[in-house]
Amino acid sequence: MADELSRRDWMKIVGAAGGGSVLATNSAAAGTAEAAAPAADAARAEILPLTSTSEVFVPPRGRAFNKFSFDFPEPSVAFDNLRFGFIVFGRDNAYAMDPHGMEATATPGGMRIACKGFTWAGGQEKHDGTLVAQLRKTADGVDIEVTATMDQPVKTVTSIVRGVPRGKLSSSGGDFADVRDNEVLLGYPFGGGDLFNAGGLTTPVAVIQSADDAYMTISSLDDKVRTKRMYFAPGENGYKVELIHEGEGWLDQKTMRVPTWRISRTKTPEAAYAAHYEHIRTAYHFPDYATRPDVPAWLRDTALVLTLHGQHYTGYIFNDYAKQLEILRWVNTQIPGKRVLAFLSSWDGRYYWDYPNYKVNDRMGGDAAFRALVTEGQKMGFRMMPMFGMNTANKKQPGWARIADAVTHKVDGDEVDLNWVDWDNDRHQEGWLGYMNLGVPSWRNHLQGRIDEMITKYGVDAYFLDIAGGWINDTKADMHAGMRTMVNELRAKHPQVLACGEMHYDAMLEFIPLYHSGGGAKYAKDYIQRHAKFFSHLSTPAPGRGSSGVHEAGFGRFNTETLQLNASSIPTLQFVDDTFEKQRETAAAVITKARERAGI
């Protein structure tokens, strides 16, 4: 075998898997406690002496991630043709179960794994603690429930599953892809804490297709927003899968109860995803879009979204307030303004540099011009939506000290900067932006106050939250709870005003009904769009040269055949510096398509 598992160990695995099934059947057939009692010793499953290198390619054959360079103990137990092990992480180290303190016992419809004591240093040292896992057989798979206790805060608990079949992989409802011999890491939400390391999950579910009619779903049944990661390490005959639950960073939990992980087998991709999306719908209380009260009547009639690009990071102005009003007047000749939402991107000055001031900009035309843009636009029926950075603030702005305590720290304590953009094109990513947490009152009060003033002072119809889906597990407070609090308080004060987010993760569908990214992958679209609607991202190439406007992407290719429209999103038209003067014919064609789709 490629993993060089010994014949003796392999026979242990096969024997334990078969024995568990026989014992469960015999116990059920006996029907009484007396009949089952003599089989108590036999009902104990064997502890399999597996390690981190068991049943995986060593060395890796494709893309790989960091891993231990020795055989880290992963003692496991066979159940339902799979093998299960667990690792507990404190804030200082990784801890394996001590095999000498483990006991695995058949239970009605499942197996209980109990461990007294952990090991560290690759098994060379011991540490106090306990772990109890309950494996439950379901109609089509296995549920995994784990509780770990230590004498220090538990950071993370990983459930390890071996025997998962190789095949094409899909996540969060996306298309199935052949990942070959590559290792795969997926993270929920926002990459599970490392944006550019893991593939992103909008909801914690993945599916493996091993044959035309064979699908295995792995999902978390959590009802709170908490970090999940899934790591797939291939071997010759299957995957070793690590199911990682990271506890709330703002809590010190010496006992961590892991929400249920579910493994299920189905025959179609639709069935593979159906149960998970039904779970999150009920767990997070998603309202149906058709009846949800936070959708204003005008949004239900919106046939077109205009992205009006304002001022670039460098200060370059694509369209000032007066130019934007001129654009609206022309658009109103092509489609009734009351059917259009105007998205004001970077209306407040230099894109991101002037975050988080959110004040009308003099170079863009000042107060009078902005007020005219809003009021005159609304007279034509347009709805006006300015953009706000939900979790971004420039540390060099004068008011930084008042909100500095809200900068995000990951669960391990490292400060988070929004440092993944080269704003000035010096071929180096800038680091002057702090990544902010709405769960901290200072930041939430500041941002909520700026949005409230724009609504009160200028009467805007909606507000847009940039990077809305960027939840990170902070050490101070829950970003999700903070966002929900802010949105709900603004809605209570301004019930007619719409909240819109850039992108979503599952739980956000409860309180934000509109987004401009992530309209739903192939197998998720129907579920997601039952609760929310979407329009195209502001970085979508504009007609002509394909400029991304204020966004850092630069240029893309504008598709003259599709006009950058898709069936999953409200038709969207980007206006950059040359769109109105040089690309008006194409802009008119986009508007015509929007009218046709809406039956106007």
Question: What label would you give each PLM region?
Answer:
Residues 2-18:
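N-terminal secretory signal peptides and thylakoid transit peptides that target proteins
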Residues 3-5, 24-49:
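C-terminal segment of N-terminal export signals and the immediately downstream linker at the start
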Residues 47-341, 376, 383:
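Carbohydrate-recognition beta-sandwich/jelly-roll modules
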Residues 253-254, 258-259, 305-306, 313, ...:
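Active-site-proximal substrate-binding groove within the catalytic cores of carbohydrate-active enzymes
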Residues 307-322, 354-367, 429-445, 468-478:
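The substrate-binding groove and active-site-proximal loops of carbohydrate-active enzymes
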Residues 309-404:
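Aromatic- and glycine-enriched glycan-recognition loops and surfaces
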Residues 343-346, 447-475:
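Active-site groove signature of glycoside hydrolases
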Residues 390-453:
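Active-site-adjacent "subsite" loops/lids of carbohydrate-active enzymes
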